[in-house]
Curated annotation (Swiss-Prot):
The chain crosses the membrane at residues 52-76, 89-114, 125-147, 169-191, 208-231, 380-403, 417-437. Alpha-2 adrenergic receptors mediate the catecholamine-induced inhibition of adenylate cyclase through the action of G proteins. The record marks D131 as: Implicated in ligand binding. Disulfide bonds join C124-C202. It comes from Mus musculus. Keywords: Cell membrane, Disulfide bond, G-protein coupled receptor, Glycoprotein, Membrane, Receptor, Transducer, Transmembrane, Transmembrane helix. Residues 77-88, 148-168, 232-379, 438-458 are cytoplasmic. Residues 1-51, 115-124, 192-207, 404-416 are extracellular. InterPro entries: ADR_fam, ADRA2C_rcpt, GPCR_Rhodpsn, GPCR_Rhodpsn_7TM. This is Alpha-2C adrenergic receptor. It is found in: Cell membrane.
């Protein structure tokens, strides 16, 4: 992957010529004589400085893509905050980007700098199929993720129960199979050297039917599905936020924290943590009056037993919130029906308090889960938007060429620029996760700096 080694390999390949028997089959034009010897390399379209510069830039892009996506895989598999089943989609998507960087980009760079295909006819077909496969799998992954987001928003309880790791893995297998079906045609219809070409070339089928079908299947149809699904998600989320705000009014029920603009309570902030539930309960007027009445009865009973038992009762207890419980415990130690009544009231108070704590805790957990779901949905929307921005220029210009040919053909340098911008997308997803998701950011820091600290200690 290092750029000096890649540049040296390109120079050696240019001096050597096409490999094996394919040189006679593919390169028998003006660049070779009848016997296939004294092969002359094509005139390079880049200077030596440009070759070194491009090799360095693309080499850095390859290394950055591999390292970033490997970090994504490690983070999802090791971080407790990222171990949700739906994050397996991100592992598979990162794997596709790693394969693009290792199996496609180096050969695309060599083909670009050498101005001919050096690696033989068989690998040409495999290379083209892998190129289309990984690009198609990326967008089909994003399409499956958008459907997963939609079902988790519209059928939260039912779908979350069904979304097990096994189901997610089965969906990922289906995504790769669909991508393979779409990318299979290059294996049987890849582009061969046109008549009169002096040097072997490797390109996709140039017929209109293939250009349009591959563009629709690999890009435009999944993009349409993603756009419709995310528009529906936005409408559902907006309607749900409006309904909640109308129900709550200016103040939330039961003293709940006010909501922010995105419908999340302050207790479930950006870091996904809840404020600890309060143990004190603010009862209504009737329950307060009832508790005062019980406290007075217990206090009077305690005074009557004070001389015999030496017990001070609950009159000087720590506070009104705990006086009833302490009085109940004091009375429960005395015999008679009053003790049984006090014991029952103590149990009812404790049950009431524990039930309120459990209710607040469950609400808190639900808010944290909703906050994470919303952040995850937003991050994936950014990922999809960046993917479309990177690949749309290439697919639009490519399909335009398939329709009107030379009349709509872009200048070759611009078309190649669009082509490489699409490859750059494979390196951007880890950056997006780092910028927009705190769980990924924290996990990346943990992976990188914890291991570095261990190395310093050793």
């Amino acid at each position: 992957m290092a750029s000096p080694a890649l540049a040296a390999a390109l120079a050696a390949a240019a001096a050597e010529g096409p490999n094996g028997s394919d040189a006679g089959e593919w390169g028998s034009g003006g660049g070779a004589n009848a016997s296939g010897t004294d092969w002359v390399p094509p005139p390079g379209q880049y200077s030596a400085g440009a070759v070194a510069g491009l090799a360095a830039v693309v080499g850095f892009l390859i290394v950055f893509t591999v390292v970033g996506n490997v970090l994504v895989v490690i983070a999802v598999l090791t971080s407790r905050a990222l171990r949700a089943p739906q994050n397996l989609f991100l592992v598979s998507l990162a794997s596709a980007d790693i394969l693009v960087a290792t199996l496609v980009m180096p050969f695309s760079l060599a083909n670009e700098l050498m101005a001919y295909w050096y690696f033989g006819q068989v690998w040409c077909g495999v290379y083209l199929a892998l190129d289309v496969l990984f690009c198609t799998s990326s967008i089909v992954h994003l399409c499956a993720i958008s459907l997963d987001r939609y079902w988790s928003v519209t059928q939260a309880v039912e779908y979350n129960l069904k979304r097990t790791p096994r189901r997610v893995k089965a969906t990922i297998v289906a995504v790769w199979l669909i991508s393979a079906v779409i990318s299979f045609p290059p294996l049987v219809s890849f582009y061969r050297r046109p008549d009169g070409a002096a040097y072997p070339q490797c390109g996709l089928n140039d017929e209109t039917w293939y250009i349009l079908s591959s563009c629709i299947g690999s890009f435009f149809a999944p993009c349409l599905i993603m756009g419709l699904v995310y528009a529906r998600i936005y409408r559902v989320a907006k309607l749900r936020t409006r309904t909640l705000s109308e129900k709550r009014g200016p103040a939330g029920p039961d003293g709940a924290s006010p909501t922010t603009e995105n419908g999340l309570g302050k207790a479930a902030g950006e870091n996904g943590h809840c404020a600890p539930p309060r143990t004190e309960v603010e009862p209504d007027e009737s329950s307060a009056a009832e508790r005062r009445r019980r406290r007075g009865a217990l206090r009077r009973g305690g005074r009557r037993r004070e001389g015999a038992e030496g017990d001070t009762g609950s009159a000087d207890g720590p506070g009104p919130g705990l006086a009833a419980e302490q009085g109940a415990r004091t009375a429960s130690r005395s015999p008679g029906p009053g003790g049984r009544l006090s014991r029952a009231s103590s149990r009812s108070v404790e049950f009431f308090l524990s039930r309120r704590r459990r209710a607040r805790s469950s609400v808190c957990r639900r808010k944290v889960a909703q906050a994470r779901e919303k952040r995850f949905t937003f991050v994936l929307a950014v990922v999809m938007g960046v993917f479309v921005l990177c690949w749309f220029p290439f697919f639009f210009s490519y399909s335009l060429y398939g329709i009107c040919r030379e009349a709509c053909q872009l200048p070759e340098p611009l078309f190649k620029f669009f082509f490489w911008i699409g490859y750059c997308n494979s390196s951007l997803n880890p950056v997006i996760y780092t910028v927009f998701n705190q769980d990924f950011r924290r996990s990346f820091k943990h992976i990188l700096f914890r291991r570095r600290r261990r190395g310093f200690r050793q």
